[in-house]
Amino acid sequence: MDSAHSKLEQQLQQIKKAKITAETNVDQTRRKQNEQDWLEEDSHQLTQEKRVLLDFLRSGWQGEEASGFHRYLEEQQHEESQAWRRDLQDKRTDLDIELQENKDRLHTLETKQATLQKEWSQ
């Protein structure tokens, strides 16, 4: 009986440590998501500022060469903006998956802990 209780107690301690690690991972992932939110807001703001600047430049440029260069800049800006958006979305998806995996791990540990505590009290 003492051996069984000792083994259960040891398993409960291991689960407790694993839960702390899983909770820390969840918190870290949430912090990463908050940082990602800030990056997305900054990216959106920069995109708006680039559009305003390109509109300003367009109004000052004249002639076919200037117009062609302006179109080139708009295309470059659009491509860069699309690449940034894709990258931000990929990172957002990765963080969502990471958070869900951490939550699943935590849930599994909590379930296992409850089962062991039930055994302990019997």
What are these language model-derived features?
Residues 2-6, 74, 93:
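Short, low-to-moderate order helix/coil transition modules at the start of elongated helical scaffolds
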Residues 32-66:
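Extended alpha-helical coiled-coil "stalk/arm" regions
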Residues 8-13, 44, 51, 89:
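Repetitive, compositionally biased segments used for assembly/scaffolding
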Residues 1-31, 81-85, 116, 120:
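Short, charge-rich amphipathic alpha-helices with coiled-coil/heptad character
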Residues 25-42, 75-115:
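Long amphipathic alpha-helical coiled-coil segments
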Residues 2-3, 38, 68, 121:
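Extended, charged amphipathic alpha-helical "stalk" segments
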Residues 50, 58, 62-69, 73-80, ...:
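Long, amphipathic coiled-coil
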